[in-house]
Amino acid sequence: MAIVDKMTAAERLIHSAVDMLERNEDPLAVHVVASSALSLLRELVASQGNDYVSQVIKEGVYRSALAKTQGAPAGMPDSDILDAIVNAVAEGIEAGRVKSAGDIVMVASKKTVWAYLDYIFKPYNFLKHADRDPLATLDEADFDPEGALAHAMTAYLMARGDGELPEPFTVFLKKQGILV
C-alpha cells in the first residue's frame, strides 16, 4: 500500500470534487468533499505560521486597491466598509507605504475574520455536528461547491508555496472564469 501525506490527500479530495462536479453529482457531496480538503489545507497553512482567511482577505483587498490606483474597477461587492478599506489601502499604495498584501495589518477579531468562510463551512459543519442538533435542517441554497473548490485550490496554493497547481485544477479554474 502507498503512503499518503496530507498534501496528497488534499489534492486527491480536490480532484475528486472536481470530477464529481463535472459528473453533476449531488452538490452537497461535492461541497463537503471540497470543504474537507479546505479544512485540511487551512490547518497546513496554519502550521506554516499563516492564517488562510486573513491571507485571502489581505490579497483581495490589496488587489482591489491596486486596481483602483490603476483606474480599474476594484471588483469588490458594494459596501461602505469595504470601500473605505480599499480606499485606505489604495492611498497607502500611492504613498509607498503598502507594497504588498503582507503590508496590510488586520485589526478585526479572529471571529470576525473567520466569519468570512462561514458560508463555505456551513454544510460541512451541518454534517460534522449532527450530535449537537440532530433535527437541524439545511437549505440547499447554502451549497456552493464551486466556491468551496475555489477556496480549497487557493489554500492548496498557499500550503504548497510554489505557485503550481495540478492541470485539472487550472482547467477547472479556467472554466469558472477565475483563471484566464
Language model: regions and residue ranges:
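Charged alpha-helical initiation segments
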Residues: 1-32, 52
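Hydrophobic core segments within long, regular secondary-structure runs in both alpha-
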Residues: 7-18, 34-38, 58, 118-121, ...
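A short glycine/small-residue-enriched secondary-structure motif
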Residues: 9-13, 52-67
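Small-side-chain structural scaffolding
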Residues: 10, 17, 29-30, 34-37, ...
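Amphipathic alpha-helical interaction surfaces
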Residues: 23, 40-47, 126, 130-133
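Short, contiguous, well-structured surface segments enriched in hydrophobic/aromatic residues
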Residues: 28-58
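Long, charged low-complexity segments
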Residues: 58-180
